[in-house]
Amino acid sequence: MALLNDVTSVAECNRQTTMTDEHKSNINSNSSHSSNNNNNGSSSNNDNNSNDDAASSSNSKNNNTSNESSHSNNNTSSIIAEAAAKFLLKNGLNGSSSTSYPPLPPPLPANLSRTTTPTTTTTPSSSSSTASNGFLPHAKTPKSSSIMAASAAVAASVVGATASKPTIDVLGGVLDYSSLGGAATGSLPTTAVVAAAAGTAKIGKGSNSGGSFDMGRTPISTHGNNSWGGYGGRLQFFKDGKFILELARSKDGDKSGWVSVTRKTFRPPSAATSATVTPTSAVTTAYPKNENSTSLSFSDDNSSIQSSPWQRDQPWKQSRPRRGISKELSLFFHRPRNSTLGRAALRTAARKRRRPHEPLTTSEDQQPIFATAIKAENGDDTLKAEAAEAVEIENVAVADTTTNEIKIEKPDTIKGEDDAERLEKEPKKAVSDDSESKEASPGQQVEPQPKDETVDVEMKMNTSEDEEPMTELPRITNAVNGDLNGDLKASIGKPKSKPKPKAKLSSIIQKLIDSVPARLEQMSKTSAVIASTTTSSDRIGGGLSHALTHKVSPPSSATAAGRLVEYHTQHVSPRKRILREFEKVSLEDNGCVNNGSGGASSGGAGGKRSRAKGTSTSSPAGKASPMNLAPPQGKPSPSPGSSSSSTSPATLSTQPTRLNSSYSIHSLLGGSSGSGSSSFSSSGKKCGDHPAAIISNVHHPQHSMYQPSSSSYPRALLTSPKSPDVSGSNGGGGKSPSHTGTKKRSPPYSAGSPVDYGHSFYRDPYAGAGRPSTSGSASQDLSPPRSSPASPATTPRTVPKKTASIRREFASPSASSSSCPSPGDRSASPPERRHMQQQPHLQRSSPLHYYMYPPPPQVNGNGSAGSPTSAPPTSNSSAAAVAAAAAAAAAYIPSPSIYNPYISTLAALRHNPLWMHHYQTGASPLLSPHPQPGGSAAAAAAAAAARLSPQSAYHAFAYNGVGAAVAAAAAAAAFGQPAPSPHTHPHLAHPHQHPHPAALTTHHSPAHLATPKLTDSSTDQMSATSSHRTASTSPSSSSASASSSAATSGASSSAMFHTSSLRNEQSSDLPLNLSKH
């Protein structure tokens, strides 16, 4: 068949219509049939036409894949093209899979048995493959069937488009040389074999959809001709024997008719000599399939496995059958170490082996297979060893065991925590932690440790009893032995009710696995954890303990989902991570709404329930939602640092931090998302990650952020790819698993880049480590952070883990503020995230700047925070706390979006006043440093509102610009700042509408304002920061009016100005942030 003509016509069609429209394409194919043929200069019009039939329909279908709809260029295929176009339009094929591969220019020697018109050199258009009825490429089919084939062929033409050369249809392993005919024109034959698995028309690229079969062609699946390509099937495209694309019919409601399928080794039944042929040759030659000893189907990648069924180059080259496949696939059951087969069971088994079909006697049947091992009597040590083995042996049992344990513990534990934990793989651990928390409420500080250890039930047990690897034993014992379990319960203070040893073992295994990083962290940070617990400040204790628990907990705290996301981020596909994050979001959303609000009001311990419940619950909650934990860390810290008033905002913030958890998803999704995820992980796990390299990535950003307060912050930015802060850090620390995600997503969220900028900026400022206002901390973190970006794990190590832990305690607020906001920001919604991310970047930048340039309140939003930080006039500590809380809330308000709408509203109302207040606070210092700071304060308020409004993305109630503005106005009115309210309103509306520049700027400024405060509180200066913040707050009120007026008038400009000002301070960070968006 005249594939060449087809290709040419396709090229022509492409030229004509670029396939913008299936309709257009159809028209082109219809009107261009002859013109295409003419263009093709095809000598055989019939062949061309039949080819074109397939091609035209194929081309029209290719609309989805590329601009190949226009490829349909057959005279006869005009009808088909129209039908195909209609079909495509109906199915939304238009560009559904617009994957047009670059044409393969290498000309194939024209051994085109069929190419009647090699004369025309087809321009290898992206859609050069002519659609052929897959199996009868040359067989001419009725046009109606051609149309059907055409729809299938469209996919083929897509392949052709990808091949952009005549495609060879190899059916039954026979090359379609007519297809190759086009190759003579200098295009490589593209075997665009559309293998329609489910009765989809299989269209070979140069195959005519004629009724008569071609010589060598076996109608492998003529059904393709009769059935519409659109109905239940898959189109597989092969080029040069290499699988290039597979399209499956999209499910109803999909935008496009065809969706690309991840490559599967689906080989439709074919006459191909060997379906298992695995072409290994990397030689791409234009020889016909069997002429090349190295095989035409070449691929260095694994696509060779998908070698075209039609074109198997080396049938003799069988993929080596796996020798022991039956053994490889066998599943082994390793009995629990503590159960042994009884003699009777062994006898029965031996008899069954000899006479498998002989029925068992009832006595035998009733006999227990396992005799309880006496080993259980050996005590914890033996059990522990056995448990460890069981961990390896009985992972399968883990799920059941975990469930059992959870159920057993559930009564003792907080249901919500239990549920959340149960939802995640570490429910039991969480439960243990919860029970421990409840029982250890006297020793809540210990509880955070358990939470750290929550990663591991053992860890939990341990924390209850002791912070030692011994906890593993109790946990293992717990899992292994009911008796041991009881002992554990007693030690934990919570009796575990008759856990099945097996279940216990599995749970222990899980916990042990989970606790490895936690244990490392625990060992490294036990003293820190103890110190945190000793700090006993709910916020500090909660924050630190959460930090530690997060550290330990990240795997377990995050729960299975979190663990997988955080721990295995490196190994888990982004999609899975996102899914897991979504699970977490749903789980933690509930926690957020329930615990978050409760926690927010209750403690500042954490928007998340873990924080809310204080240390006792917080550790389990943290476990349940590591994201929650980390942000709460920051939040609680600010709370203690600032004051109660700060606490509730901090808590609110924390809830968003929880949202961070959700934002983990966002972080996964967006560049910031890596940060977001990391921020949740980073917040939650960062602390825990210090010891654990994986977690450390996440951990570091926050840790660095938290630890040096200022230095930490920049360090986090630089060091921690995972930290929301470290979105930029992503650039700095690409090693973080999240970091990768962040980088990946950074473009979407442009958080990564901003962070990167921030990172570089931080780097620069940090490079000038002399700048960091926070003395040693900043400096210390500075240099390591530099390294840290490369190795986030290193960054935390900059400071002794204990120190880091403590610092985290204090830095938690800043970390929360910067880290959580970023996750929150990212998470709140993609736009929000961008705002937020930018804001967090600015925040980060600002905290860094505060640290780096703390005395200079240069940074607009930052400057104000910075000035409070470095030289804040002390005012009302409660006001300062409120400001800090507001800042935190501002950072986290986007989180509320993940909260429920009502929570968001609450957050907006609560935070808006706080925001207003906070922004006033921030703004007044800002105002003093900058004329724009007033605008910055207004922008901050607007950013707060915008943050609230971004939530509109999630809940469409009054969090839109107007709703946010109203909330902001109400808040402002509550705070007696009418002007900021209006400013907020414009900003709110504006950020929503223009989240990128002005909104970002606004967010950035507010974030900076908020972050510096939070950062201040987060640092050791936390107490001082209280006064600073209060100082900020008190000026804020005055500043608020100025700022409101300034902001209202120049919200955008002020935001932009802030951006410039931030640019000055965080030149890389903010501008990049803006550029990001």
Curated annotation (Swiss-Prot):
<dbReference type="GO" id="GO:0008052">
    <property type="term" value="P:sensory organ boundary specification"/>
</dbReference>
<feature type="compositionally biased region" description="Polar residues">
    <location>
        <begin position="837"/>
        <end position="846"/>
    </location>
</feature>
<feature type="modified residue" description="Phosphoserine">
    <location>
        <position position="720"/>
    </location>
</feature>
<dbReference type="GO" id="GO:0003677">
    <property type="term" value="F:DNA binding"/>
</dbReference>
<keyword id="KW-0539">Nucleus</keyword>
<feature type="compositionally biased region" description="Low complexity">
    <location>
        <begin position="811"/>
        <end position="829"/>
    </location>
</feature>
<feature type="compositionally biased region" description="Gly residues">
    <location>
        <begin position="596"/>
        <end position="607"/>
    </location>
</feature>
<feature type="compositionally biased region" description="Basic and acidic residues">
    <location>
        <begin position="449"/>
        <end position="459"/>
    </location>
</feature>
<keyword id="KW-0597">Phosphoprotein</keyword>
<dbReference type="GO" id="GO:0000122">
    <property type="term" value="P:negative regulation of transcription by RNA polymerase II"/>
</dbReference>
<feature type="modified residue" description="Phosphoserine">
    <location>
        <position position="723"/>
    </location>
</feature>
<dbReference type="GO" id="GO:0048190">
    <property type="term" value="P:wing disc dorsal/ventral pattern formation"/>
</dbReference>
<feature type="region of interest" description="Disordered">
    <location>
        <begin position="14"/>
        <end position="75"/>
    </location>
</feature>
<dbReference type="GO" id="GO:0090571">
    <property type="term" value="C:RNA polymerase II transcription repressor complex"/>
</dbReference>
<feature type="compositionally biased region" description="Low complexity">
    <location>
        <begin position="996"/>
        <end position="1012"/>
    </location>
</feature>
<dbReference type="GO" id="GO:0008587">
    <property type="term" value="P:imaginal disc-derived wing margin morphogenesis"/>
</dbReference>
<feature type="compositionally biased region" description="Basic residues">
    <location>
        <begin position="984"/>
        <end position="995"/>
    </location>
</feature>
<feature type="compositionally biased region" description="Low complexity">
    <location>
        <begin position="640"/>
        <end position="684"/>
    </location>
</feature>
<feature type="region of interest" description="Disordered">
    <location>
        <begin position="976"/>
        <end position="1077"/>
    </location>
</feature>
<feature type="region of interest" description="Disordered">
    <location>
        <begin position="269"/>
        <end position="322"/>
    </location>
</feature>
<feature type="compositionally biased region" description="Low complexity">
    <location>
        <begin position="269"/>
        <end position="286"/>
    </location>
</feature>
<feature type="compositionally biased region" description="Low complexity">
    <location>
        <begin position="293"/>
        <end position="308"/>
    </location>
</feature>
<dbReference type="GO" id="GO:0003714">
    <property type="term" value="F:transcription corepressor activity"/>
</dbReference>
<dbReference type="GO" id="GO:0036335">
    <property type="term" value="P:intestinal stem cell homeostasis"/>
</dbReference>
<protein>
    <recommendedName>
        <fullName>Protein hairless</fullName>
    </recommendedName>
</protein>
<dbReference type="GO" id="GO:0016360">
    <property type="term" value="P:sensory organ precursor cell fate determination"/>
</dbReference>
<feature type="region of interest" description="Disordered">
    <location>
        <begin position="340"/>
        <end position="368"/>
    </location>
</feature>
<feature type="compositionally biased region" description="Basic and acidic residues">
    <location>
        <begin position="408"/>
        <end position="439"/>
    </location>
</feature>
<feature type="region of interest" description="Disordered">
    <location>
        <begin position="533"/>
        <end position="876"/>
    </location>
</feature>
<feature type="compositionally biased region" description="Polar residues">
    <location>
        <begin position="704"/>
        <end position="713"/>
    </location>
</feature>
<dbReference type="GO" id="GO:0045746">
    <property type="term" value="P:negative regulation of Notch signaling pathway"/>
</dbReference>
<feature type="compositionally biased region" description="Low complexity">
    <location>
        <begin position="115"/>
        <end position="130"/>
    </location>
</feature>
<dbReference type="GO" id="GO:0035019">
    <property type="term" value="P:somatic stem cell population maintenance"/>
</dbReference>
<feature type="compositionally biased region" description="Low complexity">
    <location>
        <begin position="1023"/>
        <end position="1055"/>
    </location>
</feature>
<comment type="function">
    <text>Is a potent antagonist of neurogenic gene activity during sensory organ development. The expression of distinct cell fates by the trichogen (shaft) / tormogen (socket) sister cell pair depends on the level of H activity. A certain threshold level of H activity is required, below which both sister cells adopt the tormogen fate.</text>
</comment>
<keyword id="KW-0238">DNA-binding</keyword>
<feature type="region of interest" description="Disordered">
    <location>
        <begin position="97"/>
        <end position="141"/>
    </location>
</feature>
<feature type="compositionally biased region" description="Low complexity">
    <location>
        <begin position="783"/>
        <end position="798"/>
    </location>
</feature>
<feature type="compositionally biased region" description="Polar residues">
    <location>
        <begin position="1056"/>
        <end position="1070"/>
    </location>
</feature>
<feature type="region of interest" description="Disordered">
    <location>
        <begin position="408"/>
        <end position="504"/>
    </location>
</feature>
<feature type="modified residue" description="Phosphoserine">
    <location>
        <position position="753"/>
    </location>
</feature>
<feature type="compositionally biased region" description="Polar residues">
    <location>
        <begin position="772"/>
        <end position="782"/>
    </location>
</feature>
